[in-house]
């Protein structure tokens, strides 16, 4: 009798819920969240720093000479003619220093066309002294000109010279790392107008046949120190780091290290000492830099500028990877914690796991980890009532409703309650560093280019106008000939010579 009563009770309890235990699936286990693998770490790292001068003062100077040594003896004299030449006299380093102090350039003998340099004074064309005259700037006076005087030697000697004092940015080059952390060799250098490296090993360098550049080097060129900088490691990339206040106006800039863990930025050379974190401490990231200015427009970007931009991109890439790892870490911890809570609460609320995975079912636990999922019938929506499809929601459970006497509903408005507030996100704005520009845009090289262009334009006019066959060249020659007394004398003397020859032939025939 007792067994029959117990069987009836169990049958009633089984029909009290809309779920059945006859077609369960499983077993299942709630697994922990698996973190994705991203090899990025952010640490404070020891670095040795070599600092050179930010700029070095350079004196750029040029000097050359045009000479025309002529003799006119008539058409029958084999010595008649002109010898013309251009000779380059690039100033020495000592001369450039004197030019800068005196504020003027020095040059040699100046003999103008139609002046006093004829006869015995024509030998002044062979005077190669370079310190007889001075001027703030000197250009040729009669470039490619000739001057002839009958039965005399003549000389045209004219010079061009000038100088400019400018500042040239300094950088480290030829960096080679030795066996020790501090064993590094390097060279200080700047760039010429073509972007080629100019080493500062020598106080002066010859730019071309006419031009010399002399540097005013300070006594102490390089200082050495150490600091700690914030770096990203990983992703099969060499470290990318952000410079701190130790680097003065470069604070906040980014630099990418090479395979030897060395890097250069402007007048700084950096070498990582240990390649790893300092006690695993996480670095603090900065995004603002008061020293950054807007990029100068209208100038070409140098390779150095492009490299700096790439370093910013590398930092942004590594930073994104690192931040993603940190986000994954937090999310993973939350998900694992939530998994533990669900695993525990699911043993009390057998419908919890079914609702979380979006199915109508209840959990039937086999032990502390394994369980089966048993299907439940769909009852539809309860809406604002506590009853649906013959079942009632009571004391947190869905049960069979026998008579519906306890069913009720809310007729008024329902106030929503939000458990989570909206979160506003902030993202850093990366600034581009000030562009250095290509070397040919620097003040000193642009000045030299302008001076060379003036010389080219002068010589091009002389060659194209005086040496061509166009209308302009003919007018040019006729204009010069109309004011050339010797040309008129030469024409008449030639005519007289031919007349004397004809008379001599006639007299011989008569005899």
Swiss-Prot record:
**Which UniProt keywords are present, listed alphabetically?**
Glycoprotein, Membrane, Signal, Transmembrane, Transmembrane helix, Virion
Q: How does it sit in the membrane?
A: Single-pass membrane protein
- From which domain of life does this come? Viruses
Keyword Transmembrane carried by entry = yes
Q: Where in the cell is it found?
A: Virion membrane
* Signal peptide stretch: 1-16
| GO cellular component terms, A-Z | membrane; viral envelope; virion membrane
Topological region Extracellular: 17-487
Residues annotated as glycosylated: 279, 422
BP terms from Gene Ontology = symbiont-mediated perturbation of host process
Q: Which residues form a coiled coil?
A: none
Q: Which residues lie on this side of the membrane: Cytoplasmic?
A: 506-511
User: Which sequence ranges are marked TM in the entry?
Assistant: 488-505
InterPro entries in the cross-refs: Baculovirus_Gp64
According to its UniProt entry, what is the function of this protein? Attaches the virus to host cellular receptor and later induces fusion of virion with host membrane.
The name on file for this protein is Envelope glycoprotein
| Native organism | Quaranfil virus (isolate QrfV/Tick/Afghanistan/EG_T_377/1968) (QRFV)
């Amino acid at each position: 009798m007792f067994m029959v009563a117990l069987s009836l009770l169990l049958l009633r309890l089984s029909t009290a819920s809309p779920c059945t235990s006859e077609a369960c699936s499983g077993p299942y286990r709630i697994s922990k969240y698996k973190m994705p693998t991203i090899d990025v770490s952010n640490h404070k790292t020891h670095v040795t720093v070599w600092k050179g001068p930010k700029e070095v003062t350079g004196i750029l100077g040029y000097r050359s000479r045009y000479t025309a040594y002529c003799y006119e003896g008539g058409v029958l004299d084999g010595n008649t003619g002109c010898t013309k030449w251009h000779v380059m006299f690039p100033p020495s380093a000592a001369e450039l220093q004197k030019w800068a102090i005196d504020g003027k350039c020095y040059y040699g003998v100046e003999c103008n066309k139609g002046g006093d340099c004829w006869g015995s004074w024509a030998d002044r064309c062979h005077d190669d002294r370079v310190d007889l005259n001075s001027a703030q700037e000197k250009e040729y006076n009669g470039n490619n000109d000739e001057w002839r005087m009958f039965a005399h030697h003549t000389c045209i000697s004219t010079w061009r010279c000038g100088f400019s004092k400018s500042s040239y940015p300094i950088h480290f080059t030829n960096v080679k790392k030795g066996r020790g952390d501090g064993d590094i060799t390097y060279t200080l250098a700047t760039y010429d107008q073509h972007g080629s490296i100019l080493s500062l090993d020598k106080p002066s360098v010859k730019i071309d046949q006419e031009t010399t550049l002399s540097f005013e080097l300070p006594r102490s060129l390089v200082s050495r120190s150490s600091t700690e900088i914030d770096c990203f490691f990983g992703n099969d990339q060499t470290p990318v780091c952000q410079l701190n206040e130790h680097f003065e106006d470069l604070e906040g800039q980014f630099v990418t290290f090479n395979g030897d863990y060395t890097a250069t930025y402007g007048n700084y050379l950096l070498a990582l000492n240990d390649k790893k974190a300092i006690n695993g401490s996480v670095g603090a990231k900065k995004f603002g830099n008061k020293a950054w200015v807007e990029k100068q427009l209208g100038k070409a970007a140098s390779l150095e500028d492009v490299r700096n931009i790439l370093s910013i991109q590398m930092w942004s890439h590594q930073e994104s990877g690192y931040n993603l790892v940190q986000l994954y870490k937090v999310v993973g911890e939350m998900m694992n914690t939530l998994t533990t809570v669900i695993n525990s609460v699911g043993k009390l609320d057998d419908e919890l796991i079914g609702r979380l995975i979006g199915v109508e079912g209840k959990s039937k636990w086999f032990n502390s980890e394994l369980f089966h999922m048993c299907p439940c019938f769909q009852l539809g929506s309860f809406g604002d009532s506590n009853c649906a499809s013959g079942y009632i929601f009571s004391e947190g459970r869905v049960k069979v409703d026998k008579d519906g006497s306890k069913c009720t509903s809310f007729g008024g408005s329902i106030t929503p309650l939000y458990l989570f507030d909206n979160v506003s996100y902030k993202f850093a704005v990366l600034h581009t560093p000030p562009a250095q520009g290509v070397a040919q845009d620097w003040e000193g090289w642009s000045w030299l280019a302008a001076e060379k262009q003036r010389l080219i334009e002068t010589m091009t006019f002389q060659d194209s106008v005086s040496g061509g066959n166009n209308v302009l060249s003919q007018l040019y020659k006729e204009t010069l000939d109309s004011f050339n007394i010797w040309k008129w004398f030469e024409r008449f003397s030639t005519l007289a010579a031919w007349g004397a020859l004809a008379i001599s032939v006639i007299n011989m025939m008569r005899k």
